[in-house]
Amino acid sequence: MTDTTRSLRDCLAPAKLNLFLHITGRRPDGYHALQSVFQLLDWGDRLHFTLRDDGKVSRVTDVPGVPEESDLVVRAASLLKAHAGATLGVDIEIDKRLPMGAGLGGGSSDAATTLLALNRLWRLDLPRTTLQSLAVKLGADVPFFVFGKNAFAEGIGEALQAVELPARWFLVVTPRVHVPTAAIFSEKSLTRDSKPITITDFLAQCGIDAGWPDSFGRNDMQPVVTSKYAEVAKVVEWFYNLTPARMTGSGASVFAAFKSKADAEAAQAKLPAGWNSAVAESMSEHPLFAFAS
């Protein structure tokens, strides 16, 4: 990342994985109550921010299928500007590297990186808790990325406790299909009554001194998605005889954990030709964590 008084370049918006995802109920407001552990990855979109003196917020790169006015990065910048009364504007460039609609948190991570970067570039010095309260207005996953640590999440994903996780490498395979989250949540067959667990339950099996994430829990959305999207089911089936694997979020990405980069790349080399995949290392902290206190 390059940090000057007028710009911030090569800001990573990291991907996330849901190491497990349990749906424990439905809230009075209609949202589903969730429990999950979010894992940051050293892989994601790259964002570039350049100050404008005219106060305008502008996205200067085209993102296919995402109009500028509805882009979460533009909404995040505009929300922060209005909240803080900032007089400066910004040009935002986005180098999209994460597949969209894949359960990796791409758009939400872009929004969080925007909040953190502009907190520094606009010299707002807002505390992290304030940025998180703004993040909630942008989407359920955005507060986690502002929180900036691997986390045990509850509620709709906004109640977060930091967790220490063992370092590892992941192979992430993304079928070329878009899975609509809202449609999966509305499916009658979706499990909505998983027994709530505690952070202690998780850490006993999967903490920094314990085992691997695939040994704990499940993704309650996975059976619904694999029943409707043969492409996702095919990836899960491919992994079956090699190593435990799991879908992240509402899909479509499927991941497996490995102890080394070499092990992950060896598995990647066995993938069928044409499959979209990436090998990524775990991260313990968001690269812009220091941009809020």
UniProtKB/Swiss-Prot annotation:
Keywords: ATP-binding, Isoprene biosynthesis, Kinase, Nucleotide-binding, Transferase. ATP binds at residues 99-109. GO terms for molecular function: 4-(cytidine 5'-diphospho)-2-C-methyl-D-erythritol kinase activity; ATP binding. It catalyses: 4-CDP-2-C-methyl-D-erythritol + ATP = 4-CDP-2-C-methyl-D-erythritol 2-phosphate + ADP + H(+). SUPFAM superfamilies: GHMP Kinase, C-terminal domain (SSF55060), Ribosomal protein S5 domain 2-like (SSF54211). InterPro entries: GHMP_kinase_C_dom (IPR013750), GHMP_kinase_C_sf (IPR036554), GHMP_kinase_N_dom (IPR006204), IspE (IPR004424), Ribosomal_Su5_D2-typ_SF (IPR020568), Ribsml_uS5_D2-typ_fold_subgr (IPR014721). Signal peptide: none annotated. Pfam families: GHMP_kinases_C, GHMP_kinases_N. Pathway: Isoprenoid biosynthesis; isopentenyl diphosphate biosynthesis via DXP pathway; isopentenyl diphosphate from 1-deoxy-D-xylulose 5-phosphate: step 3/6. It is an enzyme of class 2 (transferase). One of its GO terms (biological process) is isopentenyl diphosphate biosynthetic process, methylerythritol 4-phosphate pathway. This is 4-diphosphocytidyl-2-C-methyl-D-erythritol kinase. Catalyzes the phosphorylation of the position 2 hydroxy group of 4-diphosphocytidyl-2C-methyl-D-erythritol. Its EC number is 2.7.1.148. The active site is at residues 16, 141. Belongs to the GHMP kinase family. IspE subfamily. The keyword Kinase applies. It comes from Burkholderia pseudomallei (strain 668).
